[in-house]
Amino acid sequence: MIPGEYQLKKGDIELCVGRDSFVIEVANTGDRPIQVGSHYHFAETNSALSFDRKKAYGHRLAIPAGTATRFEPGQKREVSLLPYAGLRRIFGFRGEVMGALDDNSDSGETR
């Protein structure tokens, strides 16, 4: 093996198999490009992005880890969103959640 070399299984690798996703229309109403990373809580993105934030709550872009989607000024496009998995607790971003995404989480913190 060469340092940094990847040795992948033969065939296609499917991401997020069995996870429910949905498509949502997003418009950049601002005058500057906006880039959103793969694991950013989509409901907390830049306020110049216009979309149903309530529907996007607890979701992230359905794109490979480490990548991003760019929204140019005036651009309208559809994106796929996936629900966060695991403990469903998020911290940071714009500070709108800072804990459990769901009221029934055992974390002791709710939105």
UniProtKB/Swiss-Prot annotation:
Does this entry carry the keyword Cytoplasm? yes
Give the first-level EC class, as a single word: hydrolase
Sorted alphabetically, the keyword list is: Cytoplasm, Hydrolase
- Give the GO molecular function terms: urease activity
InterPro entries (alphabetical): Urease_beta-like, Urease_betasu_sf, Urease_subunit
* Family membership noted in the UniProt record: Belongs to the urease beta subunit family.
> What's the protein called, per UniProt?
Urease subunit beta
| Lineage, opening ranks | Bacteria, Pseudomonadati, Pseudomonadota, Gammaproteobacteria, Moraxellales
The encoding gene is ureB
